[in-house]
């Protein structure tokens, strides 16, 4: 099951095998899967029941709710950084931008290589890669917005120091942290 999941999702998300067994036990208890025996190599074989198929169809048909935003470590890091004196928020933003652009290049290359290979089953991996690319592009745009907000805030505080950004625009270069907000 783990291998099949990884094949279908491009092994993007590691699957905790212990969680798989716990989930299979719960699915069996709820009548959504049934044990069929073993495969001769010590692996239990499960099959999906009619109720399980109906549950999967319901899951596919239901939109993914965005009521509880997922934990975003970067957003938390920046939110904390701007509230603490002495933290160079600009450096955090720049380091993340470099890492995000590197990831974006890797994802784009993987998408190009996968599209060129034209192997069966690549469509699922291409969908995952497209999602990762769009998320990373959005992160870079968000980092640009964070930087612009921090610069605007520093300028509002009346600082006169200047620096050049990656796109050549001269902006306020006061260290971007909670001290610059006061």
Where are these regions (language model features)?
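Basic helix-turn-helix/winged-helix DNA-binding cores
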Residues: 1-69
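Amphipathic alpha-helical dimerization/coiled-coil segments
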Residues: 58-106
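Secondary-structure edge/capping motif, primarily at the C-terminal ends of alpha-helices
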Residues: 82, 111-118, 150, 154
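Heptad-repeat amphipathic alpha-helical coiled-coil interaction surface used
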Residues: 90, 97, 104, 111, ...
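Acidic interhelical loop/turn segments
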Residues: 109-129
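Long amphipathic alpha-helical coiled-coil segments
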Residues: 149-165
